[in-house]
Amino acid sequence: MRFAYSWLMDHLDTEWSASAVADELSRLGIEAELLHEGQDPAPFVVARVGAVKPHPSADKLKVCEVFDGADHMQVVCGASNVREGMLSVLARCGAVMPNGGPTIVEAVLRGVKSHGMLCSADELGVQGWRAQDSGILDLPSSDYEVGDSFFLSGAVIEVGVTPNRGDCLGLRGIARELVAAGVGALRPLPVADLEVFGRSPIEAEMRSAGVLMGRYIKSIKNTGDSPRWIKDRLISAGVKTISCVVDIVNYVMLVLNRPMHVYDADKIQGGKLVVGASSNTDFHALDGKKYTLSKDNLVVTDGAGVVHCIAGVIGSALSGCTLDSENIFLESAWYDPVDIAMSARKLKLSTDSSCRFERFTDPGCVKLGLDFASHMIVKYCGGVASDVVACGETPFSEGRVISFNPDSVGVIGSVEIEREEILRILTALGFDVNADKDRQWEVSVPSWRLADVRSSFDVVEEVLRMHGYDKVQEQPVVPCIAGPNGCNYDEKLSLIMLSAGLTEVVTWSFMSGAVAEKLGYSIEDLCVENPVSNKFDVMRPSLLPNLLQTAASNQACGCESVAIFELGEVYRFLDESERSICGVRSGDNVPRNPHGATRKFDFFDAKCDVLQVLTQLGIDGRLVEFRSCDRSYMHPARSADVYFRDILCGYVGELHPDLIGFFEMRSAAACFEIFLSRIPNVDDNPTGDEFLVHKYQPVKRDFAFVLDQGVQSQALVDVVGCIPGVAEVSVFDFYCGDNIPEGKVSIAVAVVMISKVGTMTESEIKDVSERIIALVAQKLGGELRAD
């Protein structure tokens, strides 16, 4: 919405400049931009046409002498209605025509110089001048003087109003905000008492949620031009002028954020207007288009059932107010925002009226808007008004009272504000405050703020907003996991993952409930009350689903190999979360090259990532157990739960093959997730083996053991690794087949032996080897493979 600064001054008594007012609005949370400060001299001025002569080289052109109040100049004009003595609008050289038009320059037209251009209504982007559908504007001398700026002079401010602040879609609301911030005082609204003739011949009935008030005004004259000051203000707001009555209604809408509709009363049958649900019928609207209505549309019908208006959206061409209308019915209403939003979206139609009703209009302003508009119509169009017709009620008839503790401002906002200042701010914003009790105030919400002020938290927000968000101290959004010396593990874990070739991503804290259920999660306690869409209707119970979708999206864009991770919160309930780190690898681990074959990411890549994470957290990898898991979304034979000290800390493995297609991934995915909040205190555990340079030569030996298939390779590594003299143990082969009994498996390990006192002798090597074989037999029931 945009408006002239001088128009705002009709409602705000202040000495602040336009630039300062725009800056203050932005500080208050209403985005404001100063479009321009006004130009001097004005680019579009009222000018008088002097002598008019035929063009020497063109029959349809005329050479005019024009006076703009300062200079006489020659202008070539092709309008058929140009004549000596008329007042019109001159676009001076340098003027930029509205709506993206050209810049006016000095030109030579068929051999004759032209210093500017005389303008038509269409060229200026305005309407409402009678009998001027073609030709240049013929301005009435009673309203305009030569040399005046045609458009309202001075600065123009444009504001971007958020959906929750519909009250600021009117200049009165903007002025009210500025007054609360200490920018001047609010001027009174000029509404005088009306002389009425009695009861309206048209009654009203409300069959839906809402309130309708109206007045019958008879014997008006709508054939004259609107007063210039109304036209100027509408033009500054980008609203085209139509007729005096319609201009007044639009003017009141922009001042009070009170959309209204005017009916030609002579077209209403049965002496009655009824607001209710529509039936399936065609509707010819004021915009010249035909719409098919349904039960989702709220409409206004007459006593004969004829639809005269889509309530809160647009009127009918059948009963719209025209220049010939003599008797009108003026409607001012409050409709449920949900009803209007549903109706407008069903028709794929958005109007100034529907945008305002959707964002909530002030239910306490229905009669004020009706009185204001009625007063102006009678003043400028004549006629006599009836008594007010009223029906229906709003859900806010009892108002809203909020229990508010003023101490909560300091607790929530981390800023100290005196109680007297809190009381001043709330009172200035229109809240009625009962501060008799020391700790709990009773705060009555003004009618224009009923849409967005619903709880004590909203009251705190209002206080902080007016006090200044720049005075609120910064607080950490998410607490970081800190080590024993205060080190930031989040940062360290990110660096470890980055060094392992994974890229960090950030996904939504929401996800699709259907996807969560597909992975076997219960979403009953995770549903969002008012989701953005059905793709984000639950809080995420795991980081994995969103990462899989991210990986699939990257593969769909041509990135065949993906390795990503995320650190974030996962939820067990809406108010209970825990910290987690999750990673996904999919595609080729080794890209195509001339030196060897490629390899896909698998279980062991993800397992390596898990061990790196746990090692960074101070956990000895030898104390980590990988136990079989039965997670429905993981591969049944290539996945494991991760345990430390018998505490389930996460899981690792390959994604179930059925889900590869579900997520539309192009290859198998290896993934892991570690729940960091479950990791116990690990201060007493080593963060890794100390790196030593050995003086003596190591000895390498390979051992192949036949073990039960249920024995994990890690168990074999742990048993062999605990023997003195053994420095390193690694698995290099698995085998099931010929010469291996049924139910058995051959696991081969490479063992590095080192002595700290000297080079190992054959007898020492033999002694360590025999101890390895004996301990494996004792602990695991394994036998050294013979062949």
Curated annotation (Swiss-Prot):
Tetramer of two alpha and two beta subunits. It comes from the Bacteria. The gene is pheT. The keyword Cytoplasm applies. Residues 38-151 form the tRNA-binding domain. GO terms for molecular function: ATP binding; magnesium ion binding; phenylalanine-tRNA ligase activity; tRNA binding. CDD domains: PheRS_beta_core (cd00769), tRNA_bind_bactPheRS (cd02796). GO terms for biological process: phenylalanyl-tRNA aminoacylation. This is Phenylalanine--tRNA ligase beta subunit. Mg(2+) binds at residues 452, 458, 461-462. Its main location: cytoplasm. Residues 694-785 form the FDX-ACB domain. The lineage of its organism: Bacteria, Pseudomonadati, Pseudomonadota, Alphaproteobacteria, Rickettsiales. PROSITE patterns: B5 (PS51483), FDX_ACB (PS51447), TRBD (PS50886). GO terms for cellular component: phenylalanine-tRNA ligase complex.
